[in-house]
Amino acid sequence: MNTIIPISPINNLKTRLSEFLTLEERKNLLFNMLRDIFKALKGLNIYAISKDPEILEFCNNLGAKTIEEKGKGLNQALNQAFSVVNEDLLIVPADIPLIRESHIKEIKKLKEEFEAIIAPSRGGGTNLLYLSRASLINLRYEGFSFLKHLEEFKRNKVSYYIYDSFYLSIDINTPEDLGEIFIHGDGSYTKRYLESLNIKVEPKHSSAGRFKIYRE
């Protein structure tokens, strides 16, 4: 199975975390999330696509083949990657550090029966997408891409499976998202890195959110 990981440049990285983490800290957060993701993807052919040479060098050192992104936007980046590899494809975002090898084993079984497998994010996005062939659908990332991709499956009569996983639904975009790593990320590079920054998490039962995230 071939895996494509599209990655934003460091300067545009996780801007919703910018009031909580410095740019250097966000870069190191990304690198530790990638370590967790690569660990889960062990044994697969991994392709990283980015405009950022530092990110590509890091991924190459982890064992990935790298593609220098030429276009603009996620859909264009992935279509560019499809010119390199276009069958037996698993698209994995760079911000789902709770992915596990067990998820990949299940996907390998499911792909024997279904042409496409999709895991939604909590916000209605697409956090994992398997396609037996790149030509099955038009990619429709951005916005509520989960629903858009379901429309594509139905329009093109593609057999698909919705992989509804809590762990795969967690993507890291805001300070509150970091709380999920403290609860569910034991043993991960990402959690160890956040702990090294003296970040603390407390429960918060209110409409304002689930966690109180702060630094000592």
Swiss-Prot record:
Pathway connected to this protein: Cofactor biosynthesis; coenzyme F420 biosynthesis
One Gene Ontology term from the biological process aspect of the record: F420-0 metabolic process
This protein's UniProt keywords: GTP-binding, Nucleotide-binding, Nucleotidyltransferase, Transferase
Enzyme nomenclature, EC number: 2.7.7.68
Keyword tRNA-binding: no
Stored Gene3D superfamilies: Spore Coat Polysaccharide Biosynthesis Protein SpsA, Chain A (3.90.550.10)
Disulfide bonds: none
Subunit-level organization: Homodimer.
PANTHER family: 2-PHOSPHO-L-LACTATE GUANYLYLTRANSFERASE
Name of the protein this chain belongs to: 2-phospho-L-lactate guanylyltransferase
Taxonomic lineage: Archaea, Methanobacteriati, Methanobacteriota, Methanomada group, Methanococci
